[in-house]
Each structure stands twice: as C-alpha cells, then as structure tokens.
C-alpha cells in the first residue's frame, strides 16, 4: 500500500488512481503511458465521484466499480462515445458460468470487503463481473427500468437487499434478470 499524505488516500502499489468518497477527491498517479490510457483512468476515478454524488457514500460495490470500469472502457470520438467490453472479459464471464462460479444474489448483495477480497484472490473476478453487469444494465435493459433501479437504490430507508430491489423493478423479477444476464454472455 502507498499513502499520499496531502490527500490522506491509501492505494495498492499497482494502482493508477483512487477515489476517496469521504474527501471527495480523486488521486491520479500519472503512471499510464499515452493520453488514451490516462483519460481512461480519469474516467474511472471520476465515475466514482459521480456515483457517490448520486447514490451516497456507500453504493453497492459491484455498481460503483462496474460503472467505473464501464466508463474507463469508453472512448470519445467526434460524434459518439464508444464502449468496449473486451473479448477477454466476455470469455472470462462465460468461463465463470461454465465453472459454476457465478452466484448473482451473493455477489450483488456482498459487502465491499468481500467484494475486494474476491477481486484480489480470483483473477479480477469482481471487476469483470461488475463491468459485465453494468454493461448489461446500460446496453440491454430498457433505460426506464435502469432509472427505476437507480431510484430504488437512492432510498436509504429501504432495508431490502440489492437482489430484492432488482426483483421489484426488473420485468419478470430477479430470476428473469439472472436468466437474461447469463444469456447475454453465453
């Protein structure tokens, strides 16, 4: 771990940046080569800021990292923004399903500690699955349903789990969500 004194932000040695919701500060280390990769890190960390502004200080880990990964994988062109979910990531999600490694309710409802532990011990599992989930929500689910889901997440008085919240807003409920998500990556 490395600590940047002026910002009081700690980050893993290999990290290119970090965001502190408490301080509302992003730290970008400038370790990346080239403008495009540097912008990707900036988009990633800036996304954390926007998520914390919209959902508060404790958004679901998968959504926070998934949105950050989504925007990190976007490039801006003259007339459009293009997102890329890489072949490696697609293959990794397919493999997770083939090996029976995906338990969506457990993953979606997990604490940040469990999320990060799985990320560190299992070949980018958490970030890749989060990126896949957010890509599915943004690119496959009707916008109104995604908006409704975000609105439900904003209610801090709602004690229900994320999977229960999805069950409320997704047509056909959580089981249909699981089927549709898995089908998108087979």
Locate the predicted segments by residue.
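Active-site recognition of the HExxH zinc-binding catalytic motif
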Residues: 40-53, 65-69
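Short, small-residue-biased leader/transition segments that mark boundaries at the very start
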Residues: 2-4
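Short pre-active-site segment immediately N-terminal to the catalytic Zn-binding motif
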Residues: 23-42, 53-59
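Acidic/His/Gly-enriched intrinsically disordered linker/tail segments
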Residues: 10-22, 26, 55-186
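Solvent-exposed coil/turn segments that connect beta secondary-structure elements
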Residues: 31-33, 46, 73-74
